[in-house]
Amino acid sequence: MALYLQIVGIIGGLYLVSTAFKILSRYSRSWKAARQHGCKPVKRYPNREPFLGSDLSRILKEENKRGKGLEAYANLHRTYGDTFAFKALSPTQLSTCDPKNIQTIATTNFDHWGVEPMRGDTLAPFLGPGVLTHDGQIWKRARANIRPTFNRAEVADLENFELYVSSLLGLIPRDGRTVDLAPLFKKLFLDTATEFIFGRSVGSLVPDSPFNALEFMKAFDASAIGLALRIKAGALKPLLFCFDKTWEKSYTQVHNFVDNQVRKALQPHSDLEKTEKLGHDSEQREKFILLDQMTKETRDPLVLRDQVLNVFMPARGVSATAISNIIFELARHPDSWESLQREVQSINGQPLTFDLIRSLKVAKTIVYETLRIHPPAPMIKRVALRDTILPTGGGPDQLSPVFVPKGTIISVHIYSVQTDPKIWGDDAKEFKPQRWAEGKPLWESKWQYEPFFAGPRMCPGQQMVLTQVTYLLVRLAQEFKGLENRDEVNEYLALGELTVQSKNGAKVSLTPAR
């Protein structure tokens, strides 16, 4: 017994010495940075429970349940500044909405920041190594594989996109009944995402489709929520989720679907099969299919599954969320819907080409404004891969550089910077598309409006999202002259962890144009 206590005492002593050494080393590096670069400490959120910050975590959790989590977080920035430190069931983290710091993280010191220490092991059971979870060579190779998917030819393939849009329009009631468009939009972009990734659509918009889209989307959403919760839990993940089997059940269902697609892609195809895979038109040009491209790099089914899921994860959600939020706002702002109607009527039956879509000023301002107040990914997290410096945020005036030790997690709060009254004026939180057409806007200075983030890790599908969402918006305005809100709750209640959508969907009634 005495020997056991001695061993425990020695181990405990070594742990304390190691911890003390790490703390002293961090303070030493911070002191040197302060002397060399003029770094000063940031303001801190005054946690009442200072060890883990459970008090702030509890507050944010309650606000998220109410659908007010984004606003609560933005209020922290209004109170404690554009860059501050906090604990929320975590070691000390940073949060910033300062444009200079965002630029530094996204581009200037891009290689100082990453995601792998934070996401790699945590997300491995579902996503595995890929563009969302890793840094370095794994990220570079994955990024190079998906880049051809989003070249102009693929982005501008609106003729094929129209096939899916027509199916969606045919499912919208034309008798004034209330309809929640959000689930239909999710089905639409599930179909388009599966086609450009796998070469074949699951056909969720097709009546009596054998594919159970609702069950699959439910499993995928549960998998995504599980990811976000585990990232948020950080070091407490093993304790909080050790007995949770529901996440595994959900992502296994998603894995089974993707594994089936991978098996098909690895099978040799005849020329006839390749033609059928492209669609009914035998003269249709050969398309870039992401999974086929990946099979040229590797034949490992597990690697292919991981790479596909890292693309499928954002591809299926961002566009559906964006168009749902647009309809949410237009149903509450009839003047903006009427302006869109006038612009659409001026098209006079011209084909909706890529160039025409880009020229529609009213539609563009509506899309931009919605992405400003409802960014699909309102918070971007990064971890310092080395000791580094942020250019601003330190000291009482928050204008001095800030020393950031290796391993520190920072939240880039896109929602806060895109609704900051200092940048956008007192009406920053109002839906006001006309602000984009009024003179030379302040936000032409970059880093104040980044709904898809920026730099090497910006969303590679940005142009595709903007093109398809604008096209769908125009087609809805062509097909329906009346848009009426049917949601009993008028305010926007946010739901979600990785991407944020309206808690109540997009409940409207539509009146046909003819």
Swiss-Prot record:
EC number: 1.-.-.-
A GO CC term attached to the entry: membrane
Membrane topology note: Single-pass membrane protein
Residues binding heme, per UniProt: C459
Pfam families with a match to the protein in the record: p450
MF annotations from Gene Ontology: heme binding; iron ion binding; oxidoreductase activity, acting on paired donors, with incorporation or reduction of molecular oxygen, reduced flavin or flavoprotein as one donor, and incorporation of one atom of oxygen
Pathway: Secondary metabolite biosynthesis
Keyword annotations of the record: Heme, Iron, Membrane, Metal-binding, Monooxygenase, Oxidoreductase, Transmembrane, Transmembrane helix
Primary localisation category: membrane
Residues passing through the membrane, by range: 1-21
Compartments where found: Membrane
CDD domains attached to this UniProt entry: CYP52
EC class: oxidoreductase
Cofactor needs: heme
Family note: Belongs to the cytochrome P450 family.
Function description: Cytochrome P450 monooxygenase; part of the gene cluster that mediates the biosynthesis of the dimeric xanthones cryptosporioptides. The pathway begins with the synthesis of atrochrysone thioester by the polyketide synthase dmx-nrPKS. The atrochrysone carboxyl ACP thioesterase dmxR1 then breaks the thioester bond and releases the atrochrysone carboxylic acid from dmx-nrPKS. Atrochrysone carboxylic acid is decarboxylated by the decarboxylase dmxR15, and oxidized by the anthrone oxygenase dmxR16 to yield emodin. Emodin is then reduced to emodin hydroquinone by the oxidoreductase dmxR7.
Name this polypeptide is given: Cytochrome P450 monooxygenase dmxL3
Native source organism of the sequence: Cryptosporiopsis sp. (strain 8999)
UniProt lineage: Eukaryota, Fungi, Dikarya, Ascomycota, Pezizomycotina
